[in-house]
């Protein structure tokens, strides 16, 4: 016979294991913890004892003091308790099956009708003493109850249950899936016991309470509420196969069903199952039991777990370390404050924030003063700062060898920078450039006297400021080219400022000396105003007159460059891992993302793993400036790398790392940081900016998609287009990218109203053109940045409100006012200047002040209608909607001309 654990009984009944252990100990069982096991018979006794509160007969003999204790608390029910106890101890002979069925069918109707009355009386029997009237009514019933029990109890081994047990039968019943191991003979014996006991219980109860006073029960129900203890059992687990209603039916279905029970039935204790059932035996105090089973089983409210109090709140925070980029809720956690406190402080200062917004340095400083906290800002980018990690790793000064100098050529547009480089390289790059101007950054290698020199050619157009700044940032020496016939121009001044900011030596090349209009002194004077003094004037800057066309002075220029490089003592460690700067990047068909780089330290080889910002990868191939393959690039040299995961941003630092995993982690952390930073910008708004954002919503926008051949040109285009804005219109760049125009670009443009695709140095394919035509999308491509900017300006001008310009037509003096019936006042005028035209707008001027502005309704000379009246002639003028005309007033005639606005 298998045993059942106390914990399983507790789970089945929905009671704590501790209470079940105590009940088992009250029955005299040797149980100490919930893990102890008892037999099925003992488990059945515990189950019955917990439900009814009455100790079974078998265990009552071992512990006889349990019942007298209950009787002592209920002195008013002494006689009834004795009768019931006596009835339970008797062992009458078994009644016949026919007698049980007849008794049950005869009594069941009346039993159901009195269920509520019996439930109330059961509660009163347990809770409060009965009055005299109750005793008198119950005494004859007790005698009858006793005789009925002696005659009809059919199961000698089954102890008689109390009135409380019987009232429990009205609860909802639960049919539980049976297990095969328990479908044995003991269950069948229980079925027979249920059948015999049902008839006894129903018959005896009917005789006991047939003539009870309903008014007394109703009165007592009003006097005192039912005790909560009687509500513990909201449902019973019963074996319907043992019910007399289903005695002849065999049910083999194992499904679990829940049904309401409207009859009195004695429960057959089921073997304990491990499956945890819903806790329906222990409802909360406020829950009520539905006697008709409507609405199913009531569920207890989930207990709310109390959050552990944060002990740190009581501790005063005096100093915190925070990253440079920190959100409001993160700052609140550092201070042991609620985010609402931080948001409230910022709101009082006029800043509207949410808990996910980043705090700037000013806000952090203000909050630190408000909360009296010392704030130390740390660099949170260290975890993905691969450049700093490289610098720490490569610190030794050993293995340093001279490297090639990096020279950047800068200057104003059309001053001959690329032509100078073409002569040095013996090439013709300038001839192949669109519009004759440089629009990309180029890096080239030149060998002079057995020494390599790396040249960087930068654009001179104003749109390429960022390109020039990048060129100056990675260079060792800057050559500023100035045309001798043009002098110092705006981009010349900008180039000087970039070079000074980079702290690099400057060499001035005075170009176009072969022209007759060349004036080198003009160049020297202009640069002297920028503190660039030539050596012959007592300064420290070399001025070299050259001609990129004839080659005059170019050898002298290269000699000065090499001499300056020797003075700088440029050295690097070729044995270290590579460190390089990305000068330009693009997307090439068949190669994918490519980048033009200049190696600053170490040696870059094919197969190296590198990371550059959010791009990483293993180098598949290296190319020189003429497209020839290389195996390695040494310090100070330039080249093109192939193999990055995506287009590297121009200006990024490229570092060689040991493993692909390390490179991927750096790139992903950097990408996540940039994404979070971008998201935070979109949520920030202050009170001062709120009105500006509302007004911005009223701006007219020109949506564009910008595609360019290289990243540097794309950056320059975006910067130039964003500048084309005023208080009425602006350019909205909805997408930009490097590479050709794709079908997704056309689809995006078609989804945006009036969107234009702008391509720079790229051409769409025939398929793309056809799809754009079908979608009604306009594609415009350019090779020169001037033309692109001018066209966008024209488009913006068409969207702007037209300019209204007035053109004066003439003036007339009112000599006499004539009142015409049904028409109004007519001004008799003499035209003193120009002409007065019918249909034109006029102003009525009195004493130099405009008193009315409207249209000419009629214009007559004598009796004839005329279109216009010239100077020196008299006429009659009717003004539409105006009768307040006086003598000596002036009438001024004009027309409005609309002109397209220009940006």
From Swiss-Prot:
Record-linked InterPro entries: EF-G-like_DII (IPR053905), IF2_II (IPR044145), IF2_N (IPR006847), P-loop_NTPase (IPR027417), Small_GTP-bd (IPR005225), T_Tr_GTP-bd_dom (IPR000795), TF_IF2_bacterial-like (IPR000178), TIF_IF2 (IPR015760)
Region (G1): 411-418
Biased amino acid composition, Basic residues: 299-308
PROSITE patterns: G_TR_2, IF2
Origin species: Campylobacter curvus (strain 525.92)
GO molecular function terms listed in the Swiss-Prot or TrEMBL record: GTP binding; GTPase activity; translation initiation factor activity
Stretches with biased composition (Low complexity): 267-278
Region of interest (G3), ranges: 457-460
Role this protein plays: One of the essential components for the initiation of protein synthesis. Protects formylmethionyl-tRNA from spontaneous hydrolysis and promotes its binding to the 30S ribosomal subunits. Also involved in the hydrolysis of GTP during the formation of the 70S ribosomal complex.
Official protein name in the record: Translation initiation factor IF-2
Principal subcellular localisation of the protein: cytoplasm
Name of encoding gene: infB
Domain tr-type G: 402-569
